[in-house]
Amino acid sequence: MMFTKSTALALAAIVALSNVNAFSTSIHQPITSKAAHITSSSSLQAANNGLDTDTTLPSFSTKEEYTSYLQKAGRLPSGFAVGTAKGTFVSVEAPALGPLPIKATVIHLTEGPTDSWAAVFTKQSGCPVKVGKARLSGGHPLQALVINNKVSNVCPGGDGIAAAESVCAAVASSLNLPGGANSVLPSSTGVIGWRLPAKELAEDVAPRAIEALQTESAYAAAEAIMTTDRYPKLRSKTLSDGVRVVGVAKGAGMIEPNMATMLGYIMTDATIEKSKLQTMLTEACNRSFNSISVDGDESTSDTVVAIASGLKPLSSEDELKDALFEVCEGLSADLVRNGEGTGHVIRVTISNFPGSEYDARRMGRHLVNSPLVKCAISGNDPNTGRIAGAIGSFMGKFFPTESVAEMSLTLGGRTIFNNGQFVLEGDAVEKELSGHMSDAQLGEHDDFPKHQKFVEIGVDFGGSGSDVIVLGSDLTKEYVEVNADYRS
């Protein structure tokens, strides 16, 4: 059978019936003037055999249990300090809303600037992303990052780039950075179209975040960068030689990748050439953040940064590469599980796709972005025709001449479509499939991840081809409610 337009229509009838720049060797330049207020925990810094996050997170019974787990697993790599602070501002665009909360996060390389940093940015750039791209193209070493939530600084009135630069300059001044504002990378997330409250950030919130700098855990950063996120996201891995990799991320809505997605910051104390770090990050992002979708909307602020302090020798580049991917993979799964209104996380495993990995990911995202598929899964309704219909829609548009004679579909490990027809007989099958969905359901207002289960969909085209995994979420009433009330 060939996937012509008529085939796609026939399948629909069946359904009715049933990017980025590079770096080179890490430059570690110790400086004598450091923020005197940085605190340290000798017990946490002394050993490199502390707790890491599990590849698959355990089940948690309470928010406190989850928080404690992340705080311990978030032990910072050598040479990093993190500080956060809260403040308020009044939006020029919506003054009737009154004072609104805003948070700033500062990540500081305590021992000096580094050239060994990599980044992947969205293709549709807001002001902070434009500044970040300029930092990369200019070859500037980094010594700090500053992140604010609540306002994304995208297409604002006034000069958004100048506003971002003024905050960077304030951070550089407070930390006495020899590289000045060019050694600070800005990120913003929040409401699009509002002016960045640069004065409040530069004169109040960011300086207080610097006063709060500590070298213990990255957990505070994971918490402070949240917007509509229900809980913080953090992953970590310690290599056999003691090198540490710790990542934090935020994102709950507008999650659809295009080079990168959401905000993510990965810190390591490894000594690694910047060009190699860039290659590792790009590959890790393609296999993780670029393989997820919550709602199909791309953000204009999306940024993923990996930065190395260079304080520890690296025994194995392959081990670092694997650790970087494991951290990115874990964070990307956490983003979907924490998606706005997510009631189920969908994991689509595509095997032997008759095209590139890029196109296989496109098909997977097309499937998880289908409103009909999302709604069926939200209601624990095993309407398998909607899954087949979404696949038929994609293949009919983009691969109309490809044969699907050997294609099979599974739901929860059970075959539901094979040899050109559905395999659905008896109430027991319906009950089994619905039970699989119900078992993976999340609570409407969970403020911590109670489990790590997925609604499992398998698509095997037979023969040989590309293999990918794509994650997505269902569509719930809560998603509509969150986005209806977002600015307030």
UniProtKB/Swiss-Prot annotation:
Keyword Amino-acid biosynthesis listed: yes
InterPro entries in alphabetical order: Arg_biosynth_ArgJ, ArgJ-like_dom_sf, ArgJ_beta_C
Post-translational events: The alpha and beta chains are autoproteolytically processed from a single precursor protein within the mitochondrion.
Residues that hold substrate according to the record: 227, 250, 261, 340, 483, 488
Record site feature (Cleavage), residues: 260-261
EC number: 2.3.1.35, 2.3.1.1
Keywords attached to this entry: Acyltransferase, Amino-acid biosynthesis, Arginine biosynthesis, Autocatalytic cleavage, Mitochondrion, Multifunctional enzyme, Transferase
Top-level taxon of origin: Eukaryota
GO CC aspect terms: mitochondrial matrix
Pfam families given in the database record: ArgJ
Leader sequence segment: none
Single GO term (MF): L-glutamate N-acetyltransferase activity
Family statement: Belongs to the ArgJ family.
Subunit structure: Heterodimer of an alpha and a beta chain.
Protein name as catalogued: Arginine biosynthesis bifunctional protein ArgJ, mitochondrial
Gene source species: Thalassiosira pseudonana
